[in-house]
Amino acid sequence: DQAAISYVKSMYEQIGLDTGHMSTVYILKTGAKMLGLAALGMAASILACLMASRVGAKVGRGLRRDTFRKVIGFSNNEFDQFSTASLITRSTNDIQQIQFLTVMILRIVLYAPVMAIGGILKVSKTNVDMFWIIGLAVLLIVMVVAVLFIVVMPKFKIVQNMVDKLNLVSREILTGLPVIRAFHTEKHEEERFDKANKDLTKLNLFVNRAMTFMMPTMMLVMNGITVLIVWVGGHSINDGAMQVGDMMAFIQYAMQIIMSFLMICMISVMLPRAAVSAERVDEVLKSETKIHDPKEPKTLPKNGKGEVAFEHVSFHYPGAEEDVLHDITFTAKPGETTAFIGSTGCGKSTLVNLIPRFYDVTEGKITIDGQDVRDLTQHALRDKLGYVPQKGVLFSGNIASNIMFGNPAGSEQEMTEAAQIAQAVEFIDTKPERYKSPISQGGANVSGGQKQRLSIARAIAKHPDVYIFDDSFSALDYKTDTVLRSALKEKTTDSVVLIVAQRISTILHAEQIIVLDDGKIVGKGTHEELLKTCDTYYQIAASQLSESELKEAMKEED
């Protein structure tokens, strides 16, 4: 061969051809083509990465948006099913896993088959006899991945559940830190957090060790296959059946094929964790919302004043066998205050939570201005309500944004009027920025009483037809409570006012007091009437009022 090459070269030189120059030109042209293809491949790779990242980000954004919209529409039934910590994990960590897998699929799953097919086509032109070596390599890789699947797959769901648990423990500790310090139980809470943290760390270490085992095993397979190709190829070269260049090309193409399968297998290993995350997100998205708008909603009368009526209402929580409320019937009229009182756990808060449809009644119906609340859209219903929960809830922003939360288009005069009625002006005026004073997350920089007054002001600024105060005056002192209710009475002359209370003093002057005991109405009337007709109410009053106050009230009735 070498002699033939030398002879041909000498013949070219004899006829005047410069073989050296020709070789140089050929090398330069081929090198330029190779550089061009490499640059094109680099540009295509960068473009593919950018497009994959863009698509992945959009997938993540869409899932977060859909999950958030779904959660916003949850009733209390769904919130009882999914813990807050779990919903946060599903909306962040789980969606991030899905987003990461989406990017990897677009970058690798489309690229790897093309690379594998190209490698197979090239190998078929070099030496088909050693193709069984590539098949052996692929088989070994699949076996390694299958073992990892069997070992690791069941652990991924446990990992996500443990993340939920750790988030729950962290949230409980952070929100309850003042109580923890007051009872000096920091050590116990540290141990509780450490246990959740160690359990998660231990399982993560197991999963990561199993995953770490994969790459060295894959490299061992690749190096072993290279040695096998050299060994088999060496014998073929020795027998004259193969050239050294063909063997080197076969090694390169074989590595290309094996790498493509390796990349697909790596995606396959990521798939179980993302599949668990996708399943958890899907649980939220596909959860059936118990409270939904009717297909053909009705509208409230334009001249309605918000009269609320309960007609033989009974209710039990999902999964519970016994009713929490039994055959509740009453009417709350505009311009009047209807109060609910009773022992702890008698169903007062549950009753008022049925009006905005946080839950739906089990039996009977609730009407506003004669329309069943289930026949209205949730927006139309809640637009008529001003709700103040037991625990004051504030949002990050400032005092003004919190007061005008339900009426963002309201005027400054409406805001100051609401603050004055809620007795919030006295502490707002002490702040340098007054209504622009910042409110930290959850209202952590204001006291419980201030938080409650701002929550009341928020409801007043909305100008609703129906006010619902769910034990909202409990954080106020007696003086503030009295002045606030007096100012509120003047403001709500045309509105329905529903008050859940523990203190008799809060509801003394209510036009209608409903006494609940074990979910049933055991008394209905004014303060003076109930002292004579309802033993349960009398016992509550006797525990809070002096004997002279009781006698005076009973004389007024006489």
Description of each model-found segment:
Residues P301-D558:
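ABC-type nucleotide-binding domain
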Residues A38, I108, A112, V138-V142:
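Residue-level recognition of pore/gate-forming positions within transmembrane alpha-helices
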Residues T289-N303:
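Pre-NBD coupling/linker segments of ABC/ABC-like ATPases
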Residues N76-N77, N93-T102, L106, L110, ...:
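An intracellular "coupling" helix at the cytosolic face of ABC transporter transmembrane type-1 domains
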Residues G118, K122-L139, M143, F206-R280, ...:
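Helix-loop-helix
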Residues L28, L37-T84, I88, T92, ...:
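Juxtamembrane helix-loop junctions of ABC transporter transmembrane domains
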Residues T67, V71, I180, F193, ...:
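Helix-loop junctions and hydrophobic alpha-helical segments within the transmembrane domains
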